[in-house]
Curated annotation (Swiss-Prot):
Pfam families: S4. This is Small ribosomal subunit protein uS4. PROSITE patterns: RIBOSOMAL_S4, S4. InterPro entries: Ribosomal_uS4 (IPR022801), Ribosomal_uS4_arc (IPR022802), Ribosomal_uS4_CS (IPR018079), Ribosomal_uS4_euk/arc (IPR005710), Ribosomal_uS4_N (IPR001912), S4_RNA-bd (IPR002942), S4_RNA-bd_sf (IPR036986). One of the primary rRNA binding proteins, it binds directly to 16S rRNA where it nucleates assembly of the body of the 30S subunit. Residues 194-216 are annotated as: Disordered. Belongs to the universal ribosomal protein uS4 family. It comes from Methanosarcina barkeri (strain Fusaro / DSM 804). Keywords: Ribonucleoprotein, Ribosomal protein, RNA-binding, rRNA-binding.
Length: 216
């Protein structure tokens, strides 16, 4: 138990710290979502792990009860978990408990305030979105929001905008983006997929090795 008033660690670190594939994936997520460090990736992964663990437990209970499925308290728990994930836009409204197992870390990162500010066209880049939030330029329902990592519900998403006293309220402000790219407005494409596509497009073609001329 943590001491009162002392912040306890809200995430789990990787069990094997030197896995090359996992480390490369974490670096991609940090760059794509403009994260401060890998800890923010681990927080999202821990949140996802919690929901997946609950889903596995409920599915195991349903399998043990054979044809009856989930009943009573377990059925209520299943409905509450699904309702919360649907409310935050992490899964679709017609999803069931099985769909939780197919979620990835980027599904959690997509619902961060920082990501939503970029997708709504309130910032030019994901890094600028983080800067606008931490500097107090962004508000939800008129209330200033300064935490880039807070998860945004679908309802609150419609009320994200510039804070009333922010200079960015003026449409002539030079740092205010004119329009949002269509690929960013499409919520079905994750920022990670956008970053990977951009990287593949900018990657120069591999040149074949220079052939050595044989002696005559």
């Amino acid at each position: 138990m943590a001491y009162p008033g002392k912040k306890s660690k809200s995430f789990e670190t990787p069990r094997h710290p030197w896995q090359e594939a996992r480390m490369a994936s974490e670096v991609q997520l940090v760059k794509a979502y403009g994260l401060r460090n890998k800890r923010e990736v681990w927080k999202a992964a821990s949140t996802l792990r919690m929901y997946r663990s609950e889903a596995r437990r409920l599915l195991a209970s349903a399998a043990n009860s054979q044809e009856r499925g989930l009943e009573g308290h377990q059925k209520t728990q299943s409905e509450e978990i699904l309702a919360k994930l649907i409310r935050y836009g992490i899964i679709k409204s017609d999803a069931d408990i099985d769909d939780i197992l197919s979620l990835k870390t980027e599904n959690i990162l997509e619902r961060r305030l920082q990501t939503q500010v970029l997708r709504l066209g309130l910032a030019r880049t994901v890094v600028q979105a983080r800067q606008f939030i931490t500097h107090g330029h962004i508000a939800i329902n008129g209330r200033k929001a300064t935490v880039p990592g807070m998860l945004v519900s679908k309802e609150d998403e419609m009320h994200i905008g510039y804070y009333a006293t922010s200079p960015l309220v003026s449409e002539s402000h030079p740092e205010r983006p004119v329009q949002v790219a269509s690929v960013l407005a499409d919520s079905t494409t994750t920022l990670r997929a956008v970053a990977e596509a951009k990287q593949a497009k900018e990657k120069p073609p591999e040149r074949g090795g220079r052939k050595r001329r044989g002696r005559r």
